[in-house]
């Protein structure tokens, strides 16, 4: 058995994926997320008895670190990095606490919480260590290592991105995946028929994680991963651009996205908390896109925009 230290961050829901990525980059073996919305939005289809949960706008994100890592210094470093993100999401209610987990073999024990999850009609996320799960019918298996975080496919923003890709991909497309994280959307795009995928992330750790996950799946030769800040300096024209990142970051890329999306092509934007959806819509429409579809799950929005002169069938067209 090994001893572990944990750092738990209570923060606004919209910051969940960004903070998870920050904690992984700081050396965590993985993160655990406790969100009241997961219980409140759960459909009681199988007679489960769920705990009574008080609704909150905050989530608890817990990261686990080996005991030999200097937890006091690490906590201070993480607090400093979170403070630098204040322009992107609310820090109201923020708290950062630590705990020692004596004699806990967390590095292996946490894996029991991750099981294969059917995300869409055809796409199922399977943990990399699950070897005996077999696809049935039209089911496609996306193998990921959830311990790498950066999105495992089960978060509402990622789920809706996958639904959106199913909706717009017909086969043979060139796709740009901005802020690729785990690489899950790029892998899904290969299964859905995209001919060539270019995946970008500003974080070198995310680039490494994406490459490792992509190698676990067939079709990885179609995916090209590199470090880049959004779409700056990119000149590759695309049929589809997808980005599942913070709303305040999404609005910085709409002009570049319009420049790169081919006529009749699509821009998929997810990771958008409800009260920032109008801001993202305005930014994309000002760039020249039309809103075609709006997906909503709980407080999260996923927006599908189209670059077209024919406004028939688009929202407001």
Curated annotation (Swiss-Prot):
Catalytic activity as recorded in UniProt: L-lysyl-[protein] + 3 S-adenosyl-L-methionine = N(6),N(6),N(6)-trimethyl-L-lysyl-[protein] + 3 S-adenosyl-L-homocysteine + 3 H(+)
Source domain of life: Bacteria
Biological process annotations from GO: methylation
InterPro entries: Ribosomal_L11_MeTrfase_PrmA (IPR050078), Ribosomal_PrmA_MeTrfase (IPR004498), SAM-dependent_MTases_sf (IPR029063)
Stored PANTHER family: ELECTRON TRANSFER FLAVOPROTEIN BETA SUBUNIT LYSINE METHYLTRANSFERASE (PTHR43648:SF1)
Role description: Methylates ribosomal protein L11.
UniProt KW Kinase keyword: no
Pfam families linked: PrmA (PF06325)
Family membership: Belongs to the methyltransferase superfamily. PrmA family.
EC number: 2.1.1.-
Alphabetized NCBIfam families for the sequence: prmA
This protein's name: Ribosomal protein L11 methyltransferase
Keyword flag Transferase: yes
Chain positions recorded as S-adenosyl-L-methionine binding sites: 158, 179, 201, 244
Annotated source species: Lactococcus lactis subsp. cremoris (strain SK11)
Single GO molecular function: protein-lysine N-methyltransferase activity
Keywords: Cytoplasm, Methyltransferase, S-adenosyl-L-methionine, Transferase
Coiled-coil residues: none
Cellular component annotations (GO), alphabetically ordered: cytoplasm
Subcellular location: Cytoplasm
